[in-house]
Amino acid sequence: MKHRDIRKVIIDALESAIGTDAIYFDGRPAVLEEGDFPAVAVYLTDAEYTGEELDADTWQAILHIEVFLEAQVPDSELDDWMETRVYPVLAEVPGLESLITTMVQQGYDYQRDDDMALWSSADLKYSITYDM
């Protein structure tokens, strides 16, 4: 399946660059525990058929690369993770060019665990298009 392949090549590239300093998730984790940090999740949302060309099977989705750290870390530590470890890897992901057509940065959001106060995250987002 194309979605699984997209996530896999990105996780492989991140794991190759970052190493075992992080736990990697194929999809957004439903639960994180104290020993799970730092964590990096790669997932897709809003995947839909574009309908731009007749007889084409072109899709678009939002690709998320979300870094999770302990709740008490400042946003600057999340920025450091994104800017020095994650973002540079995404400039050239081996094998990704054969899976997607375009990849455009959308920005990123900060989030906090409001329920358990265990984690904080930075969610880097890209708009991607691809043929199924």
UniProtKB/Swiss-Prot annotation:
BP-aspect Gene Ontology terms = symbiont genome ejection through host cell envelope, long flexible tail mechanism; viral tail assembly
Any one of the GO CC terms: host cell cytoplasm
Q: Which Pfam family is an annotated match for this chain, by its short name?
A: Phage_tail_U
Main location as per UniProt: virion
Where does this one sit in the cell?
Virion; Host cytoplasm
Q: Which UniProt keywords apply?
A: Host cytoplasm, Late protein, Viral genome ejection through host cell envelope, Viral long flexible tail ejection system, Viral penetration into host cytoplasm, Viral release from host cell, Viral tail assembly, Viral tail protein, Virion, Virus entry into host cell
Recorded coiled-coil stretches: none
Among its keywords, does the record have Chloroplast? Answer: no
Q: What domain of life?
A: Viruses
**Complex and partners:** Homohexamer. May bind to major tail protein and /or tape measure protein.
Q: Which family does the similarity line name?
A: Belongs to the lambda-like tail terminator protein family.
Question: What task does this protein carry out?
Answer: Plays an essential role in tail assembly by capping the rapidly polymerizing tail once it has reached its requisite length and serving as the interaction surface for the completion protein.
Q: What is this protein called?
A: Tail tube terminator protein
Q: Which organism is it from?
A: Escherichia phage N15
